[in-house]
Structures are given as C-alpha cells and as structure tokens.
C-alpha cells in the first residue's frame, strides 16, 4: 500500500527501505538485491541505493514508498491518493510515470487500486474507473466511457475538472433556449423526448467569440498554463477554460460561443438522456 503521506524509514537508506519487506520474510540476499534493483529501476531511482531518505525530494520519497510496495510482488496494490501532497509539477510528472511503472513493475495478473479525488488523474491513468460519492457507487466502466457518457449529473460533475457546466434549458422549434439565449438544436438531440432538460457542456467546449453571447466575469482563475473564467448571465453560472494566460477583471463583459455538437442532455431526474457520443441511460 502507498499512502498520500510519504512513509519511509528515516534511519535506513533507499536500498534498505525497499528491501525491508523482503528482509522480514528472510528472503535470500541475492534475490533481495535483484528484486530491489528491479523495483528501483521501474520507479526511476536506479543509482540511488545508498542515498539517505532525508536527501531525497518529496517525489523521490514517494517513489521509494512505491518501490517498496512493488518489491513484494503483491497481487493487489493500493495507492491512497499518492500524489496529493506533491507540488503541481511533480504530480504531473509522476502521473505520467505511473502508467509505465504499473506496466513494467507489476505482473500481468496484478490489480492496482488507485484512489483519487482528482478526475484528471483518474482519466489520465485510465483503466476501469469506479465513481464514488459518499460511499455510493454511481458508475463503473472504462475511463473513456465515464468521460464520454456520464450516467448522471453527479457523475458529470465529479468526473470533470472543472465540473461540467449544467444549465436549465428547453427545446422550442428546433432551438435550444436558456437565459434568453438560442442555439441550434444539434442532430444528436433531435430525438430528445423531454422539452425541458438539463444542458451539460464542458468548460473546454465554450470559447471566447466576438459574435457570441454576453456574460459577466465573476472570477478569473489562472491554473497552470490556462485561464478559468467564472461567468454569469441571469441566474446561470458557468466556467470556461482558455488555453492561455489572460487577464480579466471582475464585472468585465465577455462574449462566448458554445460548441453545440458537444452538448449533453440530462432529464429532470438528472439521468443522461443523450450525449455527443451516442450514450443514454433512459
């Protein structure tokens, strides 16, 4: 098991930390040396065997913890939010490396249970995803299926960062209407049974546009290399993501357009009625 807090033995060096569970089992010294070398190589710490734990960065310490778990050749590996205490850059780096580590450092019949509150981690690491909310299973399936066809409004909110925008909308004469805005009814919603529905659209599917609809800026949030704009119009609140760092002031007026081919429809009970990818749970 790998915890969110780095748990290593401070009085032991890297090799001794990783070898510890095998020493406890009284495994042959040569086997220990081979297995530790293999595990350290899989987590990118080959050559660090004699380093003291205190000499390592946070990311390196977490890799030592992971190597110690891998060296056991356990059938089930549980990682409890292993990246949460790392800085942004390290999280990005290790998230990419974990996929390679799992494929190289584990046997084919091993199972990895990766717990996270970050939907990006779940989607990027991939595999089978279980969406939980207050202990209740909301949806189970491949990461791609969860992303493309979230079963309910709650799943759509949980499995996206920022959460999927949800707006109260209605269909009238082949138009979608909300907050005095009208957009064309996309083909994938043409057979929608209900007139009134919850419209879902991701932040990345809304763009700034000189010919778009006017909204007011409530907050401009810089996140890495992108800007998240929190906007309002009437009683509706939405977030859009811009793939560059831009400056906005509160109460600025901006115009935006919606990619109607990426609109989701959830019925009044919050269940997916139609998605751009053909999914429906009604």
Short names for language-model regions:
Residues 142, 154, 170, 216-218:
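Residues located in well-ordered beta-strands
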Residues 120, 144, 153, 165, ...:
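Glycine-centered loop/turn positions within well-structured domains
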Residues 4, 11-151:
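ABC ATPase nucleotide-binding domains
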Residues 164, 175-282:
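Non-catalytic connector elements of ABC transporters
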Residues 148-172, 259:
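C-terminal boundary and immediately downstream tail of ABC-type ATPase nucleotide-binding domains
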